[in-house]
Amino acid sequence: ALENFFPPLQGWLLRNVGAYSVVRGTMDLPCFRCTRRLLAAGEHPVVIFPEGEIVGQNDVIGAFQPGVAQFAFWALDELRAASQGPLPPVYAAPVTMKYLLPGDVRPALARRMALMERKLNLTDPRTDLYDRLGKIGEAVLAIAEREYGLTPAPGGLFNDRVQAAKAAILARVAREVNVTLRPDRTTIDHVRMLFNAVDRITRAAPAPTAYARKLQREHQRRVSALYVDLWRVLRFAAAFDGYNPDRLTQERLMELTNRLEWEVLGSLRWVGPMTAVVHVGEPINLTAYYDEYRRDRQAALAMATHRLAAAIQEKLTELNARMTPLAALTPAGAP
C-alpha cells in the first residue's frame, strides 16, 4: 500500500527491490496499468499478496481476493488485442511461506506474559502458559467491553463475547464513515471495506475553499482515529478465532502472545531465532480459464482464485506438521 512507501528508508528499499505502490480503496489506474503491462510483456514476474490484508495467523490463509486472476485476464485482453495468434500461457506460481521456531521459546514468552500481567493488574499468574494467556485475553476483552459500552450476557461464552465485540466495533466504524456492512461478508471483508473507506476520507483531495479545507481536516482527524478500532478488530480476530487449544503449538502460542502484547503494550516483538520455509508450487496456467472468463467473468475469477488458494492451503497444511506441539516439549523445569 502507498503508506508503506512514506518512511524514507523503507520507501527507498521497497523501490529498489522493484516494488510499486497501490492506493487502497480506490481504482488506482496507474498501478493497474503498470501491472497489466508487466504481465503482458512477460519479462518480469509480479509478486502479489493475494489475501489483501494481514490476518496474523501462521497456519491458515485468509480469503483470497480475485486480483491475481483479474490482472492475468487483463493482460490476456491486451495480448489478444495485439495479436490474432494463440494466446501465450500466463502462469501464477503459488508461493507458501511458513515460519517455524526451532528452539524452546517458552521462557521468553513467559517473561512477556508477566509484563502484560503487570499492566493489567493480574496478580495470580498461572504456571501453564496457555492458561495465563487465556487470563490475559479475558482481561483485555472485559476492558474493551467497558470502553465500547457493551454488556455481555450473564454466563456468556468467551468466543461469543469476542464476536459481539468485533461486531460492535465494526458497526461503530461503519456508522462514522457511512458504510453499510453486508451480512454475507466475513469479518476480514468488513475490515478491508472499512479500511478502504477511512483511506478515501483521510486521503481525499483538498476542498476548494479555506473554510471547507478546515472542516475537511477536522473530519479527517476524527476519522483517522478509527484506524485504531479496525486494527483492534484484526488483533482480536488473529488472537481468538478458529484455533483448537488441544493442538496448540509453540508457534501458535507465540502468535497469540504477539497479538495480545500488541494490544496491551502497543508494540510487537518476535522471539527467535525463526526458520522460514518457502515453497514455490507448480505454476497454474491462468490462460486455461480465459475462454470461461470471456463467457462469465465472475465464474472464471472464482474458479481461478479458488484453485490458487487451494494450492497454497494444501501446502501450508502439510508444513503445519513441522510445527512444535507444546505437548512434545520437555516440561518447564524438568531435566
Language-model region placement:
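Membrane-interfacial terminal anchoring regions of lipid-handling membrane enzymes
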Residues: 29-46, 56-66, 70, 74-335
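Short glycine-rich anion-binding loops that position phosphate/pyrophosphate groups of nucleotides
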Residues: 51-54
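Catalytic core of membrane glycerolipid acyltransferases/transacylases, capturing the structured
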Residues: 1-27, 81-86, 102
